[in-house]
């Protein structure tokens, strides 16, 4: 310590240190020696500061030190933030259910395209609680696997008490999302595998595998060639079937068109069936069709459709169509006309088979309604003479109750189906007629804003439904016309009753006149203006009457006050006159007239005798005086 003059500090080294003022350490600090800070001083220097003050002085004097420290702090903060974000990202898991909830607006749009409506709470409940209990492998977080979705769908569409009709919109929407995934679903859907060529099958004994069964959607595994010994009308290139609402037997098969070219057609069908094609039913639901043939101008998706090889292919009704028809139309008992028109349109455009007709009736009608329709249809069967027949063999041949052996690929089978559809329509029309009830017809009245034409249609429908009469029959025109007049709106009915030569007017003339009256009705704005004007006029009349009554009361009060004042003034005058001339007191026998005694005034001889003159009139004062 003696080597260093005027040194201070806690610890020192026993080495000679040059007192040169030009020797500095890092950032202007004194030099370091063996890990110890040497604080130098001379006679002019003061004692060295403590270590804490020394470090702060270094930061204040040197910019590089500050930058280095700031960089270290920022690096530490960034590392901490990056580690926290990485940890959070690692803990967040995206599931199909959470993905659909994040894009709920897109899910609702897809559901709207399917003509259904979905709610978020029920969506979560069905996905996480209901469908996992079906035992088909549905996870609680949802899935976009079509195979699992279709198994859940088959459970939902199960007939009878085992079905879940309230879950139909939700599973249909899941199916739509999985079949045509939006951009936010595509990363979570595994791509479809392209079919790979299979090795030729070596000849062997009879195959023990069951014949190939068509699925609802294209399978991801390569399809197996069907055996050429068993041709199928429902070829694979026609598309797989969709699950039906009822467990009816599969469509009946038909023979080939001809035996000569049957083998060639089967070979073509076998070669083309190796490539899985999109389901025609799903294509029909999504509005995407296969490219049409060169000679076709429209795309038709009927149960019986002419295929590319000239053979009719069978496409059943989709469950979505059946669901929409059932829920968007009234029941047969409530409005048989509307449901009959719907079924007639379906029978005309879709050309259904016998199985399709049974499925359609079972979906849209109740059991009792279906039995009534079938009974009426069998009554409409006509014999060879053109009249209704009751022969069981002829009735069963035309309208069988059991599944017939009709081949729709032949002309004879198609003729049977055409006759069956015609009889079914006749049965629907006859079964829709209710017992005669004229009170129901009389209860049909025109609405306030209903046009006469619409009212006439409702009236005719009531005649068809509740009476045995046909409103289109000329013999019933008079009855329909009178009902039209009496049950029209009050303003229209009154004017129709006052028409000249009413008896010669036809129903068409009455409708045209009613339309003219209806169109001349005042608009709501005009009616509002008229009501406002009438209200103002009524208020003015009321005010005028009130003013007149008030004036009358004032005049009456004026007259009464005048009489009262006149009476008061007259009394005051009499009092004043009486005060000036007082009568003297009379004795008992003194005359009031002559003031003599011995007689009274009536016997006074001095009193003049003769007729009494008129009394002087008393003048009345008025308020003007």
Curated annotation (Swiss-Prot):
Residues 522-553, 573-606 have a biased composition (Basic and acidic residues). InterPro entries: G_retro_matrix (IPR000840), G_retro_matrix_sf (IPR036946), Gag_p12 (IPR002079), Gag_P30 (IPR003036), Retrov_capsid_N (IPR008919), Retroviral_Gag-Pol_poly (IPR050462), Retrovr_matrix (IPR010999), Znf_CCHC (IPR001878). Keywords: Glycoprotein, Host cell membrane, Host membrane, Membrane, Transmembrane, Transmembrane helix. Residues 1-66 are cytoplasmic. The keyword Thylakoid does not apply. It comes from AKV murine leukemia virus. Glycans are attached at residues 113, 479. It is a single-pass membrane protein. One of its GO terms (biological process) is virion assembly. The chain crosses the membrane at residues 67-86. The keyword Glycoprotein applies. Signal peptide: none annotated. Glycosylated by host. Residues 195-305, 522-625 are annotated as: Disordered. Plays a role in viral particle release. Presumably acts by facilitating the fission of the virion bud at the cell surface. May prevent the antiviral activity of murine APOBEC3. Residues 87-625 are extracellular. This is Glyco-Gag protein. Pfam families: Gag_MA (PF01140), Gag_p12 (PF01141), Gag_p30 (PF02093), zf-CCHC (PF00098). It comes from the Viruses. One of its GO terms (cellular component) is host cell plasma membrane. One of its GO terms (molecular function) is nucleic acid binding.
């Amino acid at each position: 310590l003696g080597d260093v003059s005027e040194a201070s500090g806690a610890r020192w080294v026993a080495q000679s240190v040059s007192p040169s003022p030009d020797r500095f350490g890092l950032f202007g600090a004194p030099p370091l020696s063996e890990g110890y800070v040497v604080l130098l001083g001379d006679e002019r220097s003061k004692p060295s500061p403590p270590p804490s003050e020394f470090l702060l002085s270094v930061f204040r004097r040197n910019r590089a030190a500050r930058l280095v420290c700031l960089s270290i702090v920022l690096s530490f903060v960034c590392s901490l933030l990056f580690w926290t974000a990485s940890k959070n990202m690692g803990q967040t898991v995206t599931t199909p259910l959470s993905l659909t909830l994040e894009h709920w607006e897109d899910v609702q749009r897809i559901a709207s395209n399917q003509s259904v409506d979905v709610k978020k709470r029920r969506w979560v409940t069905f996905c996480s609680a209901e469908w996992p209990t079906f035992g088909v492998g549905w996870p609680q977080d949802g899935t976009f696997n079509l195979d699992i979705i279709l198994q859940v769908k088959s459970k939902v569409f199960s007939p009878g008490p085992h079905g879940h009709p309230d879950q139909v919109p939700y599973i249909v929407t899941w199916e739509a999302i999985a079949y045509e995934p939006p951009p936010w679903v595509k990363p979570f859907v595994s791509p479809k595998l392209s079919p790979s060529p299979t090795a030729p099958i070596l000849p062997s004994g009879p195959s023990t595998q069951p014949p190939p069964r068509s699925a609802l959607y294209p399978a991801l595994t390569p399809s197996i060639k069907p055996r050429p010994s068993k041709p199928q009308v429902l070829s694979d290139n026609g598309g797989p079937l969709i699950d039906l609402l009822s467990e009816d037997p599969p469509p009946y098969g038909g023979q080939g068109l001809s035996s000569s070219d049957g083998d060639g057609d089967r070979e073509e069908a076998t070669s083309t069936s190796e490539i899985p094609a999109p389901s025609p039913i799903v294509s029909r639901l999504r509005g995407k069709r296969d490219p049409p043939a060169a000679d076709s101008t429209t795309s038709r998706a009927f149960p019986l459709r002419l295929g590319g090889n000239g053979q009719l292919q069978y496409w059943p009704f989709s469950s979505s169509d059946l669901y929409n028809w059932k829920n968007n139309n009234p029941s047969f008992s409530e409005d048989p006309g509307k449901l009959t028109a719907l079924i007639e349109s379906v029978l005309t455009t879709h050309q259904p088979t016998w199985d399709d007709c049974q499925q359609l009736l079972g979906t849209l009608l109740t059991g009792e309604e279906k039995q009534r329709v079938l009974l009426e249809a069998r009554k409409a069967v006509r014999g060879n003479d053109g009249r209704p027949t009751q022969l069981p063999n002829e009735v069963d041949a035309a309208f069988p109750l059991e599944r017939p052996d009709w081949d729709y690929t032949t002309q004879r089978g198609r003729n049977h189906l055409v006759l069956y559809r015609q009889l079914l329509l006749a049965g629907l029309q006859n079964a829709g007629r209710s017992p005669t009830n004229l009170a129901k017809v009389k209860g049909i009245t025109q609405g306030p804003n209903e046009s006469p034409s619409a009212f006439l249609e409702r009236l005719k429908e009531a005649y068809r439904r509740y009476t045995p009469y046909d409103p289109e029959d000329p013999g019933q025109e008079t009855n329909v016309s009178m009902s039209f007049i009496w049950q029209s709106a009050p303003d229209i009915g009154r004017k129709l009753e006052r028409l000249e030569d009413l008896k010669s007017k036809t129903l068409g003339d009455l409708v045209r006149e009613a339309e003219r009256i209806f169109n001349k009705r005042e608009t709501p704005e005009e009616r509002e203006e008229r009501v406002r004007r009438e209200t103002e006029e009524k208020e003015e009349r009321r005010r005028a009457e009130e003013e007149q009554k008030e004036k009358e009361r004032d005049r009456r009060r004026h007259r009464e006050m005048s009489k009262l004042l006149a009476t008061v003034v007259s009394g005051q005058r009499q009092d004043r006159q009486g005060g000036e001339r007082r009568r003297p007191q009379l004795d008992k026998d003194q005359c009031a007239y002559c003031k003599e005694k011995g007689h009274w005034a009536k016997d006074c001889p001095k009193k003049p005798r003769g007729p009494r003159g008129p009394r002087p009139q008393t003048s009345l004062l008025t308020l003007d005086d």
